[in-house]
Curated annotation (Swiss-Prot):
Catalyzes the ATP-dependent amination of UTP to CTP with either L-glutamine or ammonia as the source of nitrogen. Regulates intracellular CTP levels through interactions with the four ribonucleotide triphosphates. CTPSs have evolved a hybrid strategy for distinguishing between UTP and CTP. The overlapping regions of the product feedback inhibitory and substrate sites recognize a common feature in both compounds, the triphosphate moiety. To differentiate isosteric substrate and product pyrimidine rings, an additional pocket far from the expected kinase/ligase catalytic site, specifically recognizes the cytosine and ribose portions of the product inhibitor. This is CTP synthase. InterPro entries: Class_I_gatase-like, CTP_synthase, CTP_synthase_N, GATASE, GATase1_CTP_Synthase, P-loop_NTPase.
């Protein structure tokens, strides 16, 4: 295809409507038609990236293959399209301003007064076009974070306005709004959508397609009314009714021919219907699963739905491919005690010890790990979860009662988890961890190697602290094996206890490499062991 097509997804009325899911779903439909699709997210906050944001503020921090800390929507993009993202797929206001100020300091603006228009907007447009200029993508779908009317979003919307003018038919705007149902009146209200579109029009953007989020199916007369008052063709008004799982959204949009509407508007032939066989099979497995596997996720942010989003989705995908429903039980690690751990975990088929930072909730994780190990409950530790496995084993098996990570306590004898050497001179907090994909050599014959079916893997990381290799021999003799290491540095990446059914910890984040059509083998193996445990306990 000669020219890259650019699609912008904006949102109105309220936030958290699911712009990322709509963007990913549309991208999936276009990809299924044979097009190469890139998805990117523009976030209007002034942070350079979300790496230093509290999960309570922003949910999960996603990590890309090339080591960029990114918005959790990039996780949706990868899970839907099964293609990796990079630093170029997530841009913030902070990044834009940082680039512009750096150019100003270098004298690239030749003494001109640096302003929002044109300098900030030009930098935004440059980043929008960056992926398209690589000439490998037919479509670039850009999600604009925030809600129309937010002051933070204005430079991005102005950039979209300019691009729609410059690109002509090669550019269109999809606007997602909310149509509330008023129970007292027994009817839906379209006025918020009308006002949202009016706000968009006031900044010079006429949406080409409207997607209406709603709890109840909208009647044709409502859709026609929205089309009339929002200046949009009737066949360009799409409704997105609440569905049991986000993975049904592509099919909901396909049933209303949204992908065909997009193709016609950008001047392309509609062609054959998308090839969605594997997607349908995935949903069929989900809907027909009868038995349940129950997994406890032990972490300190579990009350926030998006804090461990990629882990939640990876477990769900693995359960579905193992023909089971996932019953995920959130266990707040701060509330786990010696007195209640047995009651809390006794009905679990397996537990996952979540990643994180800091001391809060760590003791609860250690108590949960001791119970799981002693009761042979399948356990997967991720990042800090693996480090907690090492600490628990050191205290209760090796007898190192003061064992800890120096992230929490440095004035101890047994520093079984310590700051990485290359991190000891780092002073900045943002973007300075060990980030991105690294190779890991797996020990032949280990449970981890069996899970992956190979002896070398490449997974993503986000950490500053590591297993202290001075203790490696002591752990090996005591029964905890170091079964994964970086082939270049010797850094221990994974541990397991062979005497247990499944007691495996990994320093990396396998959840960032798990998609709808390609679930991560580690989660698949963990869920299989949990299912076996469930069956054995029933016998």
């Amino acid at each position: 295809m000669a020219d890259t097509k650019y699609i912008f997804v904006t949102g109105g009325v309220v936030s958290s409507l699911g712009k990322g899911i709509v963007a990913a779903s549309l991208g999936k439909l276009l990809q299924a038609r044979g097009f190469n699709v890139a998805l990117q997210k523009f976030d209007p906050y002034i942070n350079i990236d979300p790496g230093t944001l509290n999960p309570y503020e922003h949910g999960e921090c996603y990590v890309t293959e090339d080591g960029h800390e990114a918005d959790l929507d990039l996780g949706h993009y990868e899970r839907f399209l099964n293609t990796p993202t990079t630093r170029a797929n997530n841009i913030t206001t902070g990044r834009i301003y940082q680039n512009v100020i750096r150019k100003e300091r270098k004298g690239e603006y030749l003494g001109k007064t640096v302003q929002v228009v044109p300098h900030i907007t030009d930098e935004i447009k440059r980043n929008v076009k960056l992926l398209g200029q690589k000439s490998q993508y037919d479509f670039v779908i850009t999600e604009i974070g925030g809600t129309v009317g937010d002051i933070e979003s204005l430079p991005f919307l102005e950039s979209v306005r300019q691009l729609k003018w410059e690109l002509g038919q090669n550019c269109l705007c999809v606007h997602l709004t909310y149509v509330p149902y008023i129970a007292a009146a027994g009817e839906v209200k379209t006025k918020p959508t009308q006002h949202s579109v009016k706000q968009l029009q006031e900044v010079g953007i006429q949406p080409d397609i409207l997607v209406l989020r709603t709890e109840h199916e909208l009647q044709p007369d409502i859709l026609k009314k929205v089309a009339l008052f929002c200046n949009v063709a009737p066949d360009s008004v799409v409704q997105s009714v609440d569905v049991p799982t986000i993975y049904e959204v592509p099919l909901v949009l396909q049933q209303q021919h949204m992908d065909e509407t997009v193709l016609r508007k950008v001047g392309l032939q509609v062609g054959p219907v998308p090839e969605m066989r594997q997607w349908h099979e995935f949903l069929e497995m989900k809907h027909t699963a009868r038995e349940t596997v129950t997994i406890a996720l032990v972490g300190k942010y579990v009350e926030l739905q998006d804090a461990y989003k990629s882990i939640d989705e990876s477990l769900m995908q693995a359960a579905i491919y193992n023909r089971k429903k996932l019953n995920l039980i959130s266990v707040h690690s701060e509330k786990v005690t010696e007195a209640n751990v047995a009651e809390t975990l006794k009905d679990m088929d397996g537990i996952v010890i979540a990643p994180g930072f800091g001391s809060r909730g760590v003791e609860g994780k250690l108590i949960a790990l001791k119970y799981a190990r002693e009761n042979d409950l399948p356990t997967l530790g991720i990042c800090l979860g693996m480090q907690c496995m090492v600490i628990e084993y050191a205290r209760n098996v090796l007898g190192f009662k003061d064992a800890n990570t120096t992230e929490i306590e440095s004035n101890i004898e047994h520093k079984v988890i310590d700051l990485m050497d290359e991190q000891k001179t780092v002073t900045d907090m943002g973007g300075s961890m060990r980030l991105g994909a690294y190779d890991c050599a797996l020990r032949k014959g280990s449970k981890l190697a069996a899970a992956y079916g190979k002896e070398f893997v490449r997974e993503r990381h986000r950490h500053r602290f590591e297993f202290n290799s001075q203790y490696r021999e002591a752990f090996e003799k005591a029964g905890m094996q170091c079964v994964g290491e970086n082939p270049e540095t010797g850094l221990v990446e994974a541990v397991e206890v062979p005497a247990c059914r499944w007691f495996v910890g990994v320093q990396f984040h396998p959840e960032y490499n798990s998609t709808v059509v390609n679930p991560n083998p580690l989660f698949m193996a963990f869920i299989r062991e949990a299912i076996k445990t469930r069956k054995k306990d029933k016998e």
